[in-house]
Amino acid sequence: MTRFIFVTGGVVSSLGKGIASASLAAVLEARGLKVTILKLDPYINVDPGTMSPFQHGEVFVTDDGAETDLDLGHYERFIRTRMTKRNNFTTGRVYETVLRKERRGDYLGGTVQVIPHITDEIKRRILAGGDGVDIALVEIGGTVGDIESQPFLEAVRQLKVELGNQRALLMHLTLVPYIATAGETKTKPTQHSVKELRSIGLQPDILLCRSEKEIDVDSRRKISLFTNVEERAVVPLPDAKSIYLIPRLLQSYNLDQIVLDKFGLEAAETDLAEWDEVVRREQNPEHAVTIAMVGKYMDLLDAYKSLNEALLHAGLHTLTKVKINYINAEDVETQGVSILEDADAILVPGGFGERGLEGKLMAVRYARENKVPYLGICLGMQTAVIEFARNVLKLDGANSTEFDRKSPFPVIGLITEWINEEGKVETRDESSDLGGTMRLGAQECHLEENSRIREIYGKANIIERHRHRFEVNNRFLDQLRQGGLRIGGWSSDDTLVEVVEVPDHPWFVACQFHPEFTSTPRDGHPLFTSYIQAAVEQNERAK
C-alpha cells in the first residue's frame, strides 16, 4: 500500500524542491524502502520536448522515451528507481487526455469541468505513478499562489482526504530569509505562505525551511506556533557546499523518522555509507582538469544539467576536481581556437539548429589535429563526422541536411525509419511534427571488436538513451572508413551508426546517444570516467 508525500513550494521559486525531494527519497531508500518520485508541471505544454532550453533547461529522457523535466534527472541520480513516463506529467497532458475522452463520449454528454474531471485525471495519474512502491514523493511544480497550480493543489487536497493521514502527508518547502543588516531571520514569508496553503484547505505536516544559514530554535518554535506544524517537523535546510551533503543533513534532523512516524511505518536503520563515500571523494581530489564545453546554450547552464553532473561524477571516480569552462560556440567563430588552448579535453554536447555550428566544427578540428581528448555527444558526434568529411576527406560543403538540405555531401541525414524501445518500426519524414517524433529512449547498441568504446564499456552490447532525428548517412560510410574514421558502435539492427572514433588519437570518441542520462554519483559512468582519465593524462603530459 503506497504512501504519498506531496511536496509544495512557497514564497519564491527555485528553492530546490527537486533536490530536497530526491534527498529525502535517498534517505528513505537507505532505510530499505522502495521509493519513487513524481514531478507535476503546471505549464500547458504537453511535454518540454519542443521548449527552448533557455525557457526550460534540459529535457531529461527516460528509458521508455519520455521527454521530461530535468528534476527527473536529479531523482535518478539520488535513488535507484528508474523514472518512466508515469513520473512526469503537465497540465497540457492532463487536458489533452480529458479532451480526448470528451470527444470519445466518455462523459456521456456531461459538462466537462476542472472539478471533477481535471482533478480526477490528476489523481488517477498520481495513484498510477505511485503504484508498486512503499513511498511516492509527488513534487508540485511552481509556487503556492500561482494560478496554474490550483488544479494540482485541489487534487492534492482531495487525495489527502481520500487516503487519510496514514497514507498522505504534505511537506512544504519555504524560504526563511536572513536579513544581514538586522542580523536576524524573518519568519513572516513562511507564515504567509502557509496561510495561503491553508486558505485552499491544505495544512502542511512538515515544513522544510530554506535559509542562508541554519535557523535557530526560537525561530523554529515561532514558525511552529504560527503554522500549526509540530516543532520537530519544522526542519532547517540551510545552504550546503554540495548537494550530496543534503541526504545526511536531512537525516541529522530526523526527517526520515518523522515521515515514518506519521505513516506508522517501521524500517531498518539508515545506511548512508555510499553517500558519505561520495562526499569524501568530492572533498579529497588528487588531480585537477579543465574541460572546454563548446555549445549553444551557455547562458543557461541548466540546459546541460545531466552532462555537468556526469562530468563531476567522473571526477569523483577518478579523484579529480573537474572545472568546466563553458564556451559559446559563436565565440570560437569570432575569437578563434586560442580560447581552447587551456583545456585538457574538449566536449561538444547535443543541441539543435545551425547557430554556432562553425564554432563547434573548429573545436572538433582543434581537438583532432592537436591530439586533445575529445568527446562528442549527439550533435557532437554529427559535427565530428562533418568535420572529418570536410577536412580529411576534402568533401567541400559536407554538412547535415538539418542545416543545409542542398549540401553536395549530406554526411548526416534525417532518420526515416528505426525500431523503437518496444521493438516496433517507426517512420518519419520532413513533414512530421517536431513534438514527440524523435528516436527516443533506451536503445541497444552493438560495440565493434577492437574499438576503444568496447574497451571502455568492457562488453559487446550496451543500452543507452537517445534523443535525435538525424544520423550518419550510410552512403558515406565507405569513404569515412577509408579516410581513417572508425565506426565503433551500431544500433541493434546494424543500420544506424552509434559511435565513431579516430584510432590514431589519444582519445577521440563521439556517440549518438546521451550517456549523461544514466550517470550517477555513486556509480559514475564508464564513458565519462575514461574521458576524465584521458584529460588527467593530457594535463600531466602538458606539464
From Swiss-Prot:
It holds the Pfam family GATase. Mg(2+) binds at D71, E139. ATP binds at S14, L15, G16, K17, G18, I19, D71. It catalyses: UTP + L-glutamine + ATP + H2O = CTP + L-glutamate + ADP + phosphate + 2 H(+); L-glutamine + H2O = L-glutamate + NH4(+); UTP + NH4(+) + ATP = CTP + ADP + phosphate + 2 H(+). Coiled coil: none annotated. Residues 1-265 are annotated as: Amidoligase domain. UTP binds at S13, K186, T187, K188, P189, T190, Q191, K222. SUPFAM superfamilies: Class I glutamine amidotransferase-like, P-loop containing nucleoside triphosphate hydrolases. PROSITE patterns: GATASE_TYPE_1 (PS51273). Allosterically activated by GTP, when glutamine is the substrate; GTP has no effect on the reaction when ammonia is the substrate. The allosteric effector GTP functions by stabilizing the protein conformation that binds the tetrahedral intermediate(s) formed during glutamine hydrolysis. Inhibited by the product CTP, via allosteric rather than competitive inhibition. GO terms for cellular component: cytosol. The active site is at C378, H514, E516. Its EC number is 6.3.4.2. One of its GO terms (biological process) is 'de novo' CTP biosynthetic process. CTP binds at S13, D146, I147, E148, K186, T187, K188, P189, T190, Q191, K222. Keywords: ATP-binding, Glutamine amidotransferase, Ligase, Magnesium, Metal-binding, Nucleotide-binding, Pyrimidine biosynthesis. CTPSs have evolved a hybrid strategy for distinguishing between UTP and CTP. The overlapping regions of the product feedback inhibitory and substrate sites recognize a common feature in both compounds, the triphosphate moiety. To differentiate isosteric substrate and product pyrimidine rings, an additional pocket far from the expected kinase/ligase catalytic site, specifically recognizes the cytosine and ribose portions of the product inhibitor. Catalyzes the ATP-dependent amination of UTP to CTP with either L-glutamine or ammonia as the source of nitrogen. Regulates intracellular CTP levels through interactions with the four ribonucleotide triphosphates. Belongs to the CTP synthase family. Homotetramer. This is CTP synthase. It comes from Saccharophagus degradans (strain 2-40 / ATCC 43961 / DSM 17024).
